[in-house]
């Protein structure tokens, strides 16, 4: 029987496909090693279909995840490590944190020497001094009283992606000639910190090379955005960054107390232990006020000899503060200097609606889209829970599905539960409040990565209130 023209063409295609076919050994290798990115052909109901390779493998979460869990009914500040124990030693998510110089378009100019940054130009002429982190996956889950935090390099089911982002290595200053928020080591007048007090330049209380303060959250946001006109990628410190840094610390050190004594030794199992130390939190209020009126005093980049590392470095206060030469320890977490203490940090992407009255609520709204950050309403924000109405040491946090670190209940202590203090007050009428994190140089044990204050409107300024610089390439 003669074939039709269409049938002949199909036969030719079959012969051509057979002739051009390759053996399995002749196929090129895949470009990655993540099984969640690969597809394979399967036969189902007599038909060929595609399937994610990961769904076909006995690929266990326990193999590629590490994290912590805690029983929120237990007062201990220590948490339990879970997941792959080898990952708790190698810390693959944490080791993605590294110092770099970032230009105003968000391009990495260079990565800094992981052991010591002091050999690099950090004065702003080659870019902002930032710490890169992200590009991993996380999951926050609750089962009865158990709260879990999980990290992975793989997109496991139920995990959400943490995009690449950048946070300033230092508490931010302002380039005075351009009103650009900056992360630099620069002692010229153009980067004078504090409230730009030129008459202090030759005094021991100089703010040259120090962080900028006496700025509202509103203006911190504006100054950050000045780095690139028309873009919302440059920001002051954001809640998402603060929150993730807190959980990175907790998973690494298996404690909720960031002020645990610093310890260079590993545990017998090879894990990190201890914390970041007191930080710059042990000044006397009256002496600090007399010395410089609560303005910052630690120079930006003071701990840069530690590179991408974690540690602390002693700083001696001027004798004008105290004739006894008071000493404080400046802490550093994976390249981030003074992650708490010294000065409070204004944080964007979080607004709290505090209602008056004993039966009112303090409603917490968060936003991961910088284009929607604002200080006047909650449009584009999500309600994630309610803040504690009283001040005190934090006993419980909101947590939820995104690991919220806003206090939900007080009643803890300086060495129990979260070990950090919660500050707030109840207004006479409904008010929108911003959130400050970290505490400052006189807070002592009250300070820390989870220390939070919702006492002020975003327009508030003070000598001891600063922020950091962030670059968010994409929304979370």
PLM region spans:
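Acidic glycine-/aspartate-rich tracts in secreted/extracellular proteins
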Residues: 44-47, 136-138, 172-173, 350-351, ...
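C-terminal, surface-exposed recognition/capping segments
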Residues: 241-243, 265-299, 323, 339-352, ...
